[in-house]
Amino acid sequence: MHGKFDLGMDIGSVSVNLVAMNPRGEVLREVYVRHLGETYRTALNLLESLGEEFPLDSCRLAAFTGLGGKALAESLGGAFVNEVIAQARGTYHFQPQVRTIIDMGGEDAKLILVGEEAGHLVIQDFAMNTMCAAGTGSFLDQQANRLGYPIEEFSELALKSTTPPRIAG
């Protein structure tokens, strides 16, 4: 039996990601599911599945982020957190020495520069791609699928390339 927990959910353009953590900040459950355009249904299914293992009335707080995070937060009574802030805080929690965060999302790519002042996280700067989605995760996912590779294997192959192409920018 599990005690109290905190819930975080990222509803993106390609996937829904969920994490449940105990009050000490230890990850109890982590899930990544491609939603195939069914963002709301996928998110609710994940919450229902989580409820089978963790009583949802034991949830101390729920925070939502990403493209579909605001609507879900409003409908479920949770908090909405801007994804740049969520990524910076999450990275700082698990890897406080990190100063550069690169997020390759389904619709955009972000570069987030973070620092620390007086023992607190500071977002120093961030930038997003201004070009088409060719340099983002959904494009890479589509190309992997076209070539018959799972995206996880596709990225491993890319790291072995001796002449990587410039995709966008």
Model feature map: region roles:
Residues 1-83:
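N-terminal glycine/serine-rich phosphate-binding loop of ATP-dependent small-molecule kinases
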Residues 5-7, 25-26, 60-62, 78-79, ...:
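Structural motif
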Residues 32-38, 84-90, 129-133:
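Short, acidic/turn-prone active-site loops that include or flank metal/cofactor-
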Residues 15-18, 106-112, 136:
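Short glycine/serine/threonine-rich phosphate/pyrophosphate-binding segments
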Residues 6, 10, 64-66, 103-104, ...:
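Short glycine/serine/threonine-biased micro-segments
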Residues 42-45, 49, 71, 90-93, ...:
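Alpha-helical scaffold segments in soluble metabolic enzymes
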Residues 1-2, 68-115, 119:
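Conserved phosphate-binding catalytic cores of ATP/NTP-utilizing and phosphoryl-transfer enzymes
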Residues 116, 122-163, 168:
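Glycine-rich phosphate-binding loop plus the immediately following alpha-helix
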